[in-house]
């Protein structure tokens, strides 16, 4: 195969991606398949970091809308991401990988604190780093956490796995004539009001010139194909 197009990546997975066909929790078969994908990418020579959402367990913003204090809800959501990170760590380690979970909030008996230089060192030593608890602050999504961590570790590419296979001009689930974009600039996304990620995360990525690829991860081997330069999903980078 060809040389890798990206040396260091951060993959953002939604918590819902771990549910499979269920409506709550973690499907062992799904997390095992995702772990195989990640290890395949690392064995090809990439340094791989992960951020996983917590929506399969708890979504703070949702309960805040029902009356719960937003800060409390967001803290509960952060803990949900730690649960998912530990589950992924277990799945990866069972396949022989060396993994470190690093949290933005202190849970020292469970995982490491996030320290930027240590995170980079883990990657350089061939370990997979899983960043949990978002940014450690309420009112910020795990998309923002993923963008922030990707910038901090100097990732060559931020990958966001979604339920659809890229960015469309309109909702492909509602419109059969929806058109998928192969590439976009950050300015085009703003001007066309396209849904890529939340505003804070998008601004971080744009201002740091961080390439972002939106793609679907349902097809086996897709992550490795992206690393080898295949144009899968939608690439967002640069300005108009």
Swiss-Prot record:
Pathway: Pyrimidine metabolism; CTP biosynthesis via de novo pathway; UDP from UMP (UMPK route): step 1/1. The keyword ATP-binding applies. It catalyses: UMP + ATP = UDP + ADP. Inhibited by UTP. Its main location: cytoplasm. Coiled coil: none annotated. One of its GO terms (cellular component) is cytosol. Homohexamer. Disulfide bonds: none annotated. UMP binds at residues 54, 74, 135-142. It is an enzyme of class 2 (transferase). This is Uridylate kinase. Catalyzes the reversible phosphorylation of UMP to UDP. It comes from the Bacteria. One of its GO terms (molecular function) is UMP kinase activity. Its EC number is 2.7.4.22. GO terms for biological process: 'de novo' CTP biosynthetic process; UDP biosynthetic process. It comes from Xanthomonas oryzae pv. oryzae (strain KACC10331 / KXO85). The lineage of its organism: Bacteria, Pseudomonadati, Pseudomonadota, Gammaproteobacteria, Lysobacterales.
